[in-house]
Amino acid sequence: MSWQQRIDRALDERRAAEAFRRRLPVTHGAGRWLEREGERWLNFSSNDYLGLSQHPAIIAAWQQGATRYGVGAGGSGHVSGYSEAHRALEEALADWLGYPRALLFISGFAANQALIAALAEKDDRIVADRLSHASLLEAASLSPAQLRRFTHNDPQQLAQLLAKPLAGEQLAVTEGIFSMDGDSAPLAAIHAATQAAGAVLLVDDAHGVGVIGDEGRGSCAAQAVRPELLVVTFGKAFGVSGAAVLCDEAMADYLLQFARHLIYSTAMPPAQAVALSAALRIIRSDEGQQRRDILAARIRQFREGMGEVSLGLTDSVSAIQPLIVGDNARALNLACRLRDAGCWATAIRPPTVPVGSARLRLTLTAAHHTEDINRLLEVLHGHSE
């Protein structure tokens, strides 16, 4: 089979399964409203949980950073791209989250892949929650280590897998809040299982940091857990982009030597680091707490308003509120129905989620108003005019 035949077959299969992905260019894709081609919809697809992507102080910080540093880093942080702005952000993150060190990455995907690629060796074993992010599972499957997946949020099965004989080291992998189901990991029990086995725990808290816990320190702090490796990302609550790995001194030095995604990538623009430092100050402030309180109120309003609706609402109490409808066509039709009624929501289909669990991944933010949630509920209950 030629390359072209292989490509054509794969695309045909996606189309036949109603799983073909398309991008739609928008004027504004974050915040309360999504704007496209002169129209606007209430936006229930953005990960901008605290509404910070449009915050004037963060926008001004980026502009000031660009004036001072320019618009690009100019190279890898190992060459000339590591600025005072990067160092200040790393130090602030480490202080906030209670770790000796923080290392910046250009994305959460890159951070997760870099960690596993740098750490996993032939005789090792990676034990990951089966619903972990694609970046984690892909890196684990491509590594020389043995990959085992435990049943979602099942610390007992994790402990059983970690107890099996092994010549090398073990890495347990999970998320704080899962990106497609919106549920939380039982981190205290997972941490206890990894400690008992002498394993290292990696937690990706992309959807928890900034939103949960005191000063928004995230899922781990809220459950009084301190994993050896904590990944936080900046494209959700921070309203920007990028990521950081929190760890101890020795691990940070090791990653600086062996994390290829860090070594061989141009560093994030210093202006972005300035903006992220501004976002962090807001997240830690009274304003940040007010935004978290507003988000929590919107989540309660939505869940109480859903009542006994027939759609498959999960147990999530996070900003991610999936409605699992099962069939791809039904998910697409429901997304179109919402769009026609002025609400933008995205249908998520396999392979992003398991076959038979297509869904609308609704996301709520602090930028939403009470009437926005009411409108969404009206449409979902079938009362849209």
Swiss-Prot record:
Pyridoxal 5'-phosphate binds at residues 108-109, 179, 207, 233. It is an enzyme of class 2 (transferase). The keyword Ribosomal protein does not apply. Keywords: Biotin biosynthesis, Pyridoxal phosphate, Transferase. The modification N6-(pyridoxal phosphate)lysine is found at residue 236. Its EC number is 2.3.1.47. It catalyses: 6-carboxyhexanoyl-[ACP] + L-alanine + H(+) = (8S)-8-amino-7-oxononanoate + holo-[ACP] + CO2. Pathway: Cofactor biosynthesis; biotin biosynthesis. The keyword Transferase applies. Its cofactor is pyridoxal 5'-phosphate. One of its GO terms (biological process) is biotin biosynthetic process. Homodimer. Catalyzes the decarboxylative condensation of pimeloyl-[acyl-carrier protein] and L-alanine to produce 8-amino-7-oxononanoate (AON), [acyl-carrier protein], and carbon dioxide. Belongs to the class-II pyridoxal-phosphate-dependent aminotransferase family. BioF subfamily. This is 8-amino-7-oxononanoate synthase.
